[in-house]
Swiss-Prot record:
Protein name: ATP-dependent protease ATPase subunit HslU
Family: Belongs to the ClpX chaperone family. HslU subfamily.
Designated gene of the protein: hslU
Function summary: ATPase subunit of a proteasome-like degradation complex; this subunit has chaperone activity. The binding of ATP and its subsequent hydrolysis by HslU are essential for unfolding of protein substrates subsequently hydrolyzed by HslV. HslU recognizes the N-terminal part of its protein substrates and unfolds these before they are guided to HslV for hydrolysis.
TM ranges: none
Xref: Pfam families: AAA, AAA_2
Length: 442
């Protein structure tokens, strides 16, 4: 798992997300506490439970983006799920236990990649030998049996050529593991686990089958390295490591949790609201979930929930669930200054993306400082007049601004366009002043 300090985590998040310092600090401390817990002795480690987080803030301010970036930094089993996908046990729809099953699958993939990377050197050696065997087959006697030949010098010459890439385009015939059977099983909602088990059964049927293929040396090397690395990894040990990683370092990001709040005016059973909250309680508190890889305890899995809470309030969550989300972080609405920074500061910002896209057509785009400021003001004004969708509004406004250039770019190779205040006003001014802003409403 990640050994980054909270300050380093916040610094990394700052490269992609503007503002929201409180939320960044909260997730950074939570992530670091995962590492701190693993340094304790076993008895104390068992007692230290994660402090789950509830992020509250309007749409488009960075809640989901924090989760996306955190997933890359965590280097631990991580899954992001929408709370609205689940229903109460006994009704049609996904059950909340599938969260832990999906998290375990993610851990298996993560651990397998890590283990295969460790075995890469040995796998490369084995793959190299198999390719040399295909390039320099042993002669056969009159009975069709292979005879060992002393071709060590020739083998060394070919090994040197292989490592230098001189044989990359040469075609050889190899026995490679057959691709797993692609079986798509349709099951009623809520029975995904049965579908997964049946798919695993069909895939195992053809697991040890070999197939002769003609393939170029470069492609053969990649395929053989993967095959040899997979052979060197112990599947049982891999499962144990993955389950341990889930239980100790697993992180679940539960988005749109405000959508499963029971609203006061509603009547009748809310199978996808309060029932889901009740089903989430044991997961968040700590229980044991049966997965196809083994039993998984959820006592030390970190849950980060988020929601806009525009209609519902955090207090509309059932009290037991509120108590299991002790750390509350409020994200603030974005201002014009924030929009201006979003357009220029993050890695691969919107302006950088459009410049790179147009450069493929030979068109140069230059954004002036006053042009970016006017664009930020335009997005903020539209948000104020209609529905406030936060930074997502920049995509809509930017696409409208660049519409003409994008359409004509292929005929205007070599030209330069300067996006300044006048250009923004000319393309967006009337629409911003007009009360009918349907073009901007997503």
């Amino acid at each position: 798992m990640s050994e980054m300090t909270p300050r380093e985590i916040v610094h990394e998040l700052d490269r992609h997300i503007i503002g929201q310092a409180d939320a960044k600090r909260a997730v950074a401390v939570a992530l670091r506490n995962r590492w701190r817990r693993m340094q304790l002795d076993e008895e104390m480690r068992h007692e230290v439970t994660p402090k789950n987080i509830l992020m509250i803030g309007p749409t488009g301010v960075g809640k989901t983006e924090i989760a996306r970036r955190l997933a890359k930094l965590a280097n631990a089993p991580f899954i992001k799920v929408e709370a609205t996908k689940f229903t109460e046990v006994g009704y049609v729809g996904k059950e909340v236990d599938s969260i832990i099953r999906d998290l375990t699958d993610a851990a298996i993939k993560l651990v397998r990649e890590t283990e295969m990377e460790k075995m890469k050197y040995r796998a490369e050696e084995a793959a190299e030998e198999r390719i040399l065997d295909a390039l320099l087959p042993n002669p056969r006697n009159s009975w069709g049996e292979e005879e060992k030949a002393d071709n060590s010098n020739t083998r060394q010459i070919f090994r040197k050529k292989l490592r230098e890439g001189q044989l990359d385009d040469k075609e050889i015939e190899l026995e490679l593991a057959a691709s797993p059977m692609g079986v798509e099983i349709m099951t009623p909602p809520g029975m995904e686990e049965m579908a997964n088990q049946l798919q695993g059964l069909f895939q195992n049927l053809g697991q040890n089958q070999k197939k002769k293929r003609k393939i170029k040396v470069k492609e053969a090397m990649k395929a053989l390295i993967e095959e040899e690395a997979a052979r060197l990894v112990n599947p049982e040990e891999l499962k144990q490591k993955a389950i341990a990683a889930v239980e100790n370092n697993g992180i679940v990001f539960l988005d749109e949790i405000d959508k499963i709040c029971k609203r006061g005016e509603s009547s009748g059973p809310d199978v996808s609201r309060e029932g889901v909250q009740r089903d989430l309680l044991p997961l968040v508190e700590g229980c044991t979930v049966n997965t196809k890889h083994g039993m998984v305890k959820t006592d030390h899995i970190l849950f980060v929930a988020s929601g806009a809470f525009q209609i519902a309030k955090p207090s509309d969550l059932i009290p037991e669930l509120q108590g299991r989300l002790p750390i509350r972080v409020e994200l603030t609405a974005l201002t014009t200054d924030d929009f201006e920074r979003i357009l220029t500061e993050p890695n691969a910002s919107l302006t950088d993306q459009y410049q790179a896209l147009m450069a493929t057509e030979g068109v140069k785009i230059e954004f002036t400082k006053d042009g970016i400021r006017r664009l930020a003001e335009a997005a903020w004004q539209v948000n104020e007049r209609t529905e406030n969708i936060g930074a997502r509004r920049l995509h809509t406004v930017m696409e409208r601004l660049m519409e003409d250039i994008s359409y004509d770019a292929s005929e205007k190779s070599g030209e330069t366009f300067v996006i300044d205040t006048d250009y923004v006003n000319a393309h967006l001014g009337k629409l911003i002043e007009d009360e009918d802003l349907s073009r901007f409403i997503l």
